[in-house]
Structures are given as C-alpha cells and as structure tokens.
Design a protein with these regions (language model features):
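Conserved short-loop catalytic and cofactor-binding motifs
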Residues: 15, 52, 107
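Short, intrinsically disordered, mixed-charge
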Residues: 29-36, 69, 121-128
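A generic structural signal for beta-strand entry/edge sites
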Residues: 11-13, 50, 70-72, 90-94
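Hydrophobic ligand-binding cavity/cleft-lining segments
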Residues: 1-43
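Short, highly charged C-terminal tails/helix-capping segments
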Residues: 128-154
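Beta-strand/loop substructures that line and gate deep hydrophobic ligand-binding cavities in soluble
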Residues: 76-128, 139
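Glycine-rich portal/gate segments that line the openings of hydrophobic small-molecule binding cavities
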Residues: 19, 25, 35-81
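Short beta-strand micro-motifs enriched in acidic
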Residues: 8, 67, 85-89
C-alpha cells in the first residue's frame, strides 16, 4: 500500500493506493455494495442516496456524494469526505482511497487521528480480502497505523 498523509491549512488529506488481484467488479462489489459492506464494515449500508451507519442505539445518515459503478464511490463521513476510486491497471484492479478530514473533526466516538487510523486498518483488511490473503491482526494493525498517523500529524 502506498500511503500519504498531508496536513493542509484546515484539513488532513489521507491517500491510500494499492493494487489487488480481484477484478474490478469484485473489488467494487466488496467496497461499494450492501452485500460487500457486510464482509468488512457491517455497520454500513446504502439506502437510496444515503450511506447509513448504524450500531446499537446510534444511527447516522450521510450523503452519498458520487456513485459511478465500477469507478468511484464518495460520501460524506460526518463532515469528512471519503472516496474510493477504481481502475483496471496491468491485469489487476487498482484502488485509491482518499479522505479529506477537518483537523477539528470529532464527535463522542472519534477524532481525526482515530478516524484516519481506522481507515488505514480497513484498507489493509480490504487489501487482504481482495488478494485472498489472511486478514491482519487488527490490534497490531491499529498500533502500527496509530503510530504512523501520530508521527505524520505532530
């Protein structure tokens, strides 16, 4: 995975790019469909033009900004903007994740550093799934990416 985290004036820009063995349709289905969400982010689902995040006593509806099948999905993420871009390259699929997140992002569950760490862990898991590899140890992945984010934003 190629990872870049840049500090802008008011935001952080996180970019993660990686090739996967899975074809474009399989990659899209995992990352941008309700059936796929159940495999890597079961709290998410798409309803019409909304992305729904739901767990126990919490429900958040976020605007689906772009949905171009097999190309790009982008959505509001509680004030941040998240997108996945899909391409065919050299006999594999290529995925680019981007998040533009306000430096002052935060709610009762998260802040900018935790959110970016979470997306780094999720993308590491997506890479493993789409390459038919064993999932990483989540705690180890979280520790690794927490340290990376902390170093980048200090």
């Amino acid at each position: 995975m190629k990872v870049q985290l840049n500090s802008l004036e008011k935001d952080y820009h996180l970019s993660i790019a990686y090739p996967v063995k899975a074809d474009l349709a399989e990659s899209w289905d995992l990352i941008a469909s309700n059936a796929g969400f159940t495999k890597w982010f079961p709290q998410l689902r798409i309803e019409e033009d909304k992305l729904i995040f739901e767990m126990e006593d919490f429900r958040e509806e976020m605007e689906l900004l772009v949905y171009q099948e097999n190309q790009v999905i982008a959505y509001d993420w509680d004030g941040a903007k998240v997108s996945f871009h899909f391409e065919n390259r050299d006999q594999c699929s290529y995925i680019r994740f981007e998040e533009l997140i306000p430096k002052d992002f935060g709610n009762e569950f998260s802040n900018a550093a935790k959110d970016m760490t979470g997306w780094l862990v999720q993308n590491e898991c997506l890479t493993a799934i789409l390459n038919q590899q064993k999932l990483p140890d989540i705690d180890q992945a979280r520790e690794k990416w927490q340290a990376f984010v902390a170093e980048q934003i200090k």
